[in-house]
Amino acid sequence: MSKTLYQKIYDSHIVYEDKNSESILYIDLHLLHEVTSPQAFDALRNKQRKVRQSRKTFATMDHNVSTTIQNISASGSMAQKQMEQLIKNCQEFNIPLYDINNPNQGIVHVIAPEKGMTLPGMTIVCGDSHTSTHGAFGALAFGIGTSEVEHVLATQTLKQKRFKNMKIEIIGEIPKFVTAKDIILFIIGKLGSSSGTGYVIEFCGDVIKNMSMEERMTICNMAIEMGAKSGLIAPDEITYKYLKNKIYSPSGLSWEKSLDHWKFLKSDKNAYFDKCVTVDISNLAPQITWGTNPDQVISIDEKIPDYNNINSAIKRESSKSACEYMGLQSNTYLTNISIDRVFIGSCTNARIEDLRSASKILKNKKIAKHVKAIVVPGSKLVKRQAEQEGLDRIFIDAGFEWRLPGCSMCLGMNKDRLHFGGRCASXSNRNFEGRQGRGGRT
């Protein structure tokens, strides 16, 4: 029987199958951070349980960390408490931790791939919605809640129902100045922020085949913004080249055996998909969100849509509400709107390739005097590499602040926040109300 990539990974990880309900899947890699794990560890202690597979569990500090000072006390008392608790939990349960003093610390969805922890065919979970990032390697990766974090820590398994299969084929030649972020924003805008609900989405097509791993990670990172459980891209030679000689990647004979297995990880020719979509990006322009939902997106040269012309009452009201919150008017250009902040970073766009692209545009230019702009590398490895290439000097000369790694302005959970009513042009993945700070407009 022909199978999709998702079905192959799901079926190969079944520990107990219940065809009428949820099956139990084995989890290959469990990623942790300081925010969603404390309660799970407390529950383990209360039930006198141990971590089942500490070698398949990995932790880092990213959500709360300061990007200006390498000190856990720099982000406030609550953040400090969470980070101290993570240190204690990892020591007690023998879990490897990249804390802020570790030379490899960074955003969890950046460091796991760059270290070779993320491998094709794996099941990967984390208490973070953008775990779908790892699907770029042909891994079934998704976010879980705190009670599920506890369950995986205790059993290395998780109950999961089967999701439907969606295929999105991306075709055409990528126009100049268009990036992977533009492509996925366009798809979200075209299909809607709930279009992926109930599905695991496999992205394919010539455009995907020609993308780097960094670009593929951006695509899968934002599959969750369509409501999908996860995003997947079949591994290929680009994947193998990226993974070879990484610290946690297989080596020697194990590498050859892994390659043989990974080459099997693709959807069969006649595999059935519940939904198929083809997207042509040949005439695509750079995209930008104008509202408070990722599907409220337009081309940079388009006007904000007139909500009075929207047929759906729900979408019409949503657009009207977004305009009011954002302080915008229909039929106006975003290029005429003044901004207060610029943020380059997050698990969507903080890898070395992203920083190279941004630096090319900024070279020999200066930002407006009233704008505060920051660059937050996704990891210390990315930071070191960028500094070796002189990218930090380009950003600094342009007027940006060059920061330490962390989630930073992607979410208002640390000191990097947008002031009330402030506007930020952000490379992150969400533009929800208050996402970057109370009253902030992304």
Curated annotation (Swiss-Prot):
<dbReference type="InterPro" id="IPR001030">
    <property type="entry name" value="Acoase/IPM_deHydtase_lsu_aba"/>
</dbReference>
<comment type="subunit">
    <text>Heterodimer of LeuC and LeuD.</text>
</comment>
<dbReference type="InterPro" id="IPR004430">
    <property type="entry name" value="3-IsopropMal_deHydase_lsu"/>
</dbReference>
<feature type="binding site">
    <location>
        <position position="347"/>
    </location>
    <ligand>
        <name>[4Fe-4S] cluster</name>
    </ligand>
</feature>
<feature type="binding site">
    <location>
        <position position="410"/>
    </location>
    <ligand>
        <name>[4Fe-4S] cluster</name>
    </ligand>
</feature>
<keyword id="KW-0479">Metal-binding</keyword>
<keyword id="KW-0100">Branched-chain amino acid biosynthesis</keyword>
<keyword id="KW-0411">Iron-sulfur</keyword>
<keyword id="KW-0408">Iron</keyword>
<comment type="function">
    <text>Catalyzes the isomerization between 2-isopropylmalate and 3-isopropylmalate, via the formation of 2-isopropylmaleate.</text>
</comment>
<protein>
    <recommendedName>
        <fullName>3-isopropylmalate dehydratase large subunit</fullName>
        <ecNumber>4.2.1.33</ecNumber>
    </recommendedName>
</protein>
<comment type="similarity">
    <text>Belongs to the aconitase/IPM isomerase family. LeuC type 1 subfamily.</text>
</comment>
<keyword id="KW-0456">Lyase</keyword>
<dbReference type="InterPro" id="IPR015931">
    <property type="entry name" value="Acnase/IPM_dHydase_lsu_aba_1/3"/>
</dbReference>
<dbReference type="GO" id="GO:0003861">
    <property type="term" value="F:3-isopropylmalate dehydratase activity"/>
</dbReference>
<dbReference type="InterPro" id="IPR036008">
    <property type="entry name" value="Aconitase_4Fe-4S_dom"/>
</dbReference>
<dbReference type="GO" id="GO:0046872">
    <property type="term" value="F:metal ion binding"/>
</dbReference>
<dbReference type="Pfam" id="PF00330">
    <property type="entry name" value="Aconitase"/>
</dbReference>
<dbReference type="GO" id="GO:0009098">
    <property type="term" value="P:L-leucine biosynthetic process"/>
</dbReference>
<dbReference type="InterPro" id="IPR033941">
    <property type="entry name" value="IPMI_cat"/>
</dbReference>
<dbReference type="GO" id="GO:0051539">
    <property type="term" value="F:4 iron, 4 sulfur cluster binding"/>
</dbReference>
<keyword id="KW-0004">4Fe-4S</keyword>
<keyword id="KW-0432">Leucine biosynthesis</keyword>
<dbReference type="InterPro" id="IPR050067">
    <property type="entry name" value="IPM_dehydratase_rel_enz"/>
</dbReference>
<keyword id="KW-0028">Amino-acid biosynthesis</keyword>
<feature type="binding site">
    <location>
        <position position="407"/>
    </location>
    <ligand>
        <name>[4Fe-4S] cluster</name>
    </ligand>
</feature>
<dbReference type="InterPro" id="IPR018136">
    <property type="entry name" value="Aconitase_4Fe-4S_BS"/>
</dbReference>
<keyword id="KW-0614">Plasmid</keyword>
<comment type="pathway">
    <text>Amino-acid biosynthesis; L-leucine biosynthesis; L-leucine from 3-methyl-2-oxobutanoate: step 2/4.</text>
</comment>
